[in-house]
Amino acid sequence: MAHLPLREAEDLYHVPGWGDGYYRITGQGTLAVLPLGPNGPEVDLHDAVQVLSEQGLGTPLTLRFPQILEHRVDRLNGAFHKALKDNGIKDVRYRGVFPIKVNQRKEVVQTLAKAGRKWSYGLEVGSKAELIAALTMDQNRKSLLVVNGFKDKAFLEAACEATHFKDTVVIVLDEVGELEHLIPLLDSVDRKPALGIRLKLRSKAPGKWALSGGERAKFGLTIPEVLYAVEALRQAGHLDRLQMLHFHIGSQISDIRRITQAVREATRIHCELVKMGVPLRYIDVGGGAAVDYDGSGSSGSNSANYTLEEYASSIVAQLKDVCDESGVPVPDIINESGRAVVSHHAVLIVNAIRKVPHLVLSPDEEPHDDDPTSLWNLYYTYQYLSPKNVFESFHDAVQYREDLQSLFDLGHLSLEALGRAETLFRATLGKVRDILAEEEETDTEEFEQVASLLSQKVVCNFSLFQSLPDVWGVKQQFPIMPIHRLRERPEDTATLADITCDSDGEIRRFIDLEGTKPTMATHDLRKGEPYYLAMCLVGAYQDSLGDYHNLFGETDEAWIEVDPARGNWTLTRSSSGSRVSDMLEWVRYSPADLKERIRERVKRLKDRGHIDAETAKSLTARYTGLMESSTYLEPPRAT
């Protein structure tokens, strides 16, 4: 086993880049989480998984750190308060709200609500169910409740009645047709909510969520529609309730310039409306604060070229600049950051089940006399491969392989000869890989292609569609790495496959110091020794979007907190994952009925003499017992 220096291990998995002070590699070669930030005590994930295993919690296992949620709430609110102070802005409040859709789990929202009480940190909802959930939270009454999304009469009525629970409820007009229900409702209620208008800005962000902004956005009012809404509210006598402008140009906005551009455009509209007599008090800059998943600090789609502090400072500075130019007071600032608040708190731990290698065999003989020219050319390419001709030889080998496949398809090459050709091709790739590695040419396109062609597959005990749906849905990349053996130099590269019966259930792109790569570095699997991988920063959207493909259900879950004084960690909450019976019931099978049907079928087999009494008893126990087991595979037995 080759030793790997700590600095090289950090570079290999780029932990200092994406960890943001919450993750680090220990001197013992394990991955640790620091729930209180870089200066607080740490939780060794490998130790934690072993302890939790003894308590009956197995992999796949979701670990949650509520103190990270608290730390992120403090950091976000503190950043805006500091930005207001640094810009000399007085009598203006920052009024952050958490969009429940980003993570709707009760314990997550409760933790955020409790942490936000001192900041009057509020909630944003987009459905009737989310509204009810928000109203049950123990929050500061002065915190805002922002109601977005499409709304019918019942939803609008419930939002209006929410003013009994909150001092300020803001109902946002997401499309102009909502006025038809809203104006009569305002006429009939005593406790009237504040109103907001979502703008359809010209500004937009590139990338996966580009259609959230711009003129073709799903939500929002155009300028003519805004003016129409203002006039309609004026004529109805409710213009005093229009107190907020809102915009949202997308999630994971990696380039700060896109944010400042949108803020300037929206603030200009705000100022013009104020001059027209609209009593606006708030500007809601939406969400979009990005998470630096790959740690590059760039404007790439999986990164962010700014910190939370720079995000807040840029927004406040742009607001002040435009308002000062227009002679309009700076409004209170609302933002709806969700991803940036909850991503870091959750880690999915999975165990490797097995490796599926691509065999690279040495050719044991030269081609036959009657073999085609392309096979002989491939053989000579292999024989005379050197550092001087490595790139040319690689491309030649790829072409010869294609030629030979065409000959086989046309019936001019035997299966045996095609097998020898494939063995020769893979042996050539192996030599190319070794030469490029020795020559430090690993950042080339050719090396990436070779690594991909020769990569192994590590099958892991999880469902991509349940736990990391954004990898499949929007090609999101998350930091993934082993949680132990990090001071051992990994000898292999691999992709990661889940246990669903779906070819899309595979992770084929991984973060890298220079961007992304088609494989990740992995160690050999030792017989009888579990090999654990961490899939980090999975706290945003994955819980809400995960589905039950192949009827794989929720994972086991553990909530962990650290004691700042003692430095130790404690399991504060845990839950077992879905059972087979849970998932069958979810698709409308009755577990009791299924068990009875199994008993009937077994009895029929026994009565007909197909099985004896002992086998009948064993079959019944097997299948009824299986229904109470986990939907995932048995505890780790890495081989």
What does each of the following model-derived ranges do?
Residues 67-75, 228, 265, 314:
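A non-catalytic, amphipathic alpha-helix used as a structural packing/dimerization or gating element
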Residues 30, 38, 68, 103-105, ...:
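Short, glycine-/Ser/Thr-/acidic-enriched flexible segments
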Residues 203-207, 281-300, 334-349:
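Flexible glycine/acidic-rich beta-alpha junction loops that bind and position SAM and/or redox cofactors
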Residues 314, 320-639:
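Charged (often Lys/Glu-rich) extended helix/loop segments that serve as interaction or gating elements
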Residues 300-315, 364:
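Helical (often loop-to-helix) elements that flank the catalytic cores of nucleotide-handling enzymes
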Residues 26-104:
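Low-complexity, highly charged intrinsically disordered N-terminal segments
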Residues 88-284, 291, 295, 305-310, ...:
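Active-site-proximal beta-alpha core segment in soluble small-molecule metabolic enzymes
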Residues 1-58, 561, 569, 580-583, ...:
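Conserved, well-structured core domains of diverse proteins
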